[in-house]
Every structure is written in structure tokens, then in C-alpha cells.
Amino acid sequence: VTTETAQKESLGKALGRIASGVFLVSFTKDGKKDGMLSTFVMQGGFDAPVVVVAVNNKRPLLDVLKPGDTFVVNVMSKANMDVYKSFAKPFQEGMDRYEGIALKGGTEHPVLANGVSYMTCKVLSYAPATDHQLLIAEAIDGEQLTEEEPMIHLRKNGFGY
């Protein structure tokens, strides 16, 4: 094992210990509900409240959500494992990832009925971050829906999901 390899392994383990939540970033475009799982979400400001989502450069979401568009960040708990399993599967054409998942009515974008909370966000901008883009958005609405504890995600290796 080379010194460089050992350093990368050590750094990977350290990065993997950065605890994060598990989130469903959801949106509706041209009448079609879509979304993606994310563990790279954080609050980035207070006044106005800012939410930052790191999005892999290969994700189609980057072609869909433009400045001014809105989307939802759903905070998930262990009670949302059905959602996790549905969105963790590879996408197949015609697939409805929301099939069988309870959604809150009266919202523009999919909101998990039994999620911990949700925030409706408006895209402000993107900033490059090597293999990801930082989606910077203002939280414009939101609600706590349950008293469940948010799901916590730790990784064995910080160089992968």
C-alpha cells in the first residue's frame, strides 16, 4: 500500500463520519412528479433562510431546475424506508417512483405525508464544487409534519455515497 493510497483511505474514513440527514428533493416539471434522494443538504443562511443541496454533475435535475424555479426538500425518518427504497432503485422509463407513497395534498411539488418536515425552496443560483454543483435556494415555506427523528446517514468511505 502506497503512502498516497493509505492517506486516501484514511481521509475517506474521516469524511464518511460526517453525519448527514436523508432527504427527498422533489419537484414537478411539465406535470410530471420527479425527485432524488440526497444526503448532501444543509441550511446555509438565516435571513433569508438558505438551503444548499450538493447535486452530482451527472444528475438530470441540473437541467430541470433553473433560477426562479421551486422544489421541495423533504426531511426523512426511518418511517420513510419505502420512499428510500423506491428512489434508491435505478430509474426505468415509465417508472412512477411515487406509486404507493402517501403524499400531502394541496402542494405544487410532492411532499411526503409522513415525512419529518418539508421546505419549499426557490432556486437562487448554482456554484461549482468539483464533481457536484451547489444548488443554492431560499426556503420560502415549510412545515414540521411529525415528531419522528430525522434519519441519520454515515458512510464507510467518504469518497462515495
Labelled PLM ranges:
Residues 1-161:
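Basic, polyanion-binding surface patches
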